[in-house]
């Protein structure tokens, strides 16, 4: 499943794992994507939506 929000196009951010031993490796910060059934132009549709958009009310379920 793609970790991209269909509403705001939020996608994963990238950074570093930095443990105490300082061995730095790459990591991904994935957005909290939920698969919800929403109405788009009067028809129900399944969308990948981040929880920020759900809380903001940008999606009608």
From Swiss-Prot:
InterPro entries given in the database record: Bacterial_rp_bL28, Ribosomal_bL28, Ribosomal_bL28/bL31-like_sf, Ribosomal_bL28_bact-type, Ribosomal_bL28_sf
Keywords: Ribonucleoprotein, Ribosomal protein
A Gene Ontology term for the protein's cellular component: ribonucleoprotein complex
Keyword Transferase annotated: no
GO BP: translation
Similarity section: Belongs to the bacterial ribosomal protein bL28 family.
Classification lineage: Bacteria, Bacillati, Actinomycetota, Actinomycetes, Propionibacteriales
Name of the molecule in the record: Large ribosomal subunit protein bL28
HAMAP family assigned to the protein according to its UniProt record, in alphabetical order: Ribosomal_bL28
Keyword hit for Endoplasmic reticulum: no
Molecular function in Gene Ontology: structural constituent of ribosome
